[in-house]
């Protein structure tokens, strides 16, 4: 009997998007960069931990820069030229991630900060005594 050989194709479909939205979530421990289209569907994402940084090195601005460069280069390869940037969180890698996106060739149209600010909500963590 003759067996049919199955040909495997990648499940990821290549989309060409001219403009998108870059979501940067910068916490005290990590930085996550996520690129979506205008409807909010995720196209590419990377984090500082996924780029090889572990432990305390994940929260550095250099780790955020490398995650943003990784995502930005993938987006430029797919044909993205313009992006809106939405930042949330109080972490270190906010500005360096935006600069890394601009250096990859993305034109930043708008920068929006949606960091949640409490109106005297929960008690903050105690101060460290080293």
Swiss-Prot record:
Keyword Plastid belongs to the record: yes
Subcellular compartments: Plastid, Chloroplast
InterPro entries per record: Ribosomal_uS11, Ribosomal_uS11_bac-type, Ribosomal_uS11_CS, Ribosomal_uS11_sf
Any Pfam family hit: Ribosomal_S11
Domain of life: Eukaryota
Chloroplast found in the keyword field: yes
Main location: plastid
GO BP: any one term: translation
Keywords: Chloroplast, Plastid, Ribonucleoprotein, Ribosomal protein, RNA-binding, rRNA-binding
UniProt record similarity statement: Belongs to the universal ribosomal protein uS11 family.
Description of how the protein assembles with itself and partners: Part of the 30S ribosomal subunit.
PANTHER family for the chain: 40S RIBOSOMAL PROTEIN S14/30S RIBOSOMAL PROTEIN S11
Protein name per the record: Small ribosomal subunit protein uS11c
Organism: Emiliania huxleyi
Lineage: Eukaryota, Haptista, Haptophyta, Prymnesiophyceae, Isochrysidales
């Amino acid at each position: 009997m003759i067996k049919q050989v199955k040909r495997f194709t990648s499940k990821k479909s290549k989309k060409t998007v001219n403009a998108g939205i870059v979501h940067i979530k910068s916490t005290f421990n990590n930085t996550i960069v996520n690129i979506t289209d205008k409807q909010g569907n995720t196209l590419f994402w990377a984090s500082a931990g996924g780029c090889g940084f572990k432990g305390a090195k994940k929260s550095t601005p250099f780790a955020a820069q490398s995650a943003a460069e990784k995502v930005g280069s993938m987006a430029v390869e797919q044909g993205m030229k313009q992006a809106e940037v939405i930042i949330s969180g109080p972490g270190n890698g906010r500005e360096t991630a935006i600069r890394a996106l601009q250096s990859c060739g993305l034109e930043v149209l708008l920068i929006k900060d949606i960091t949640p600010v409490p109106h005297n909500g929960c008690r903050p963590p105690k101060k460290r005594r080293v």
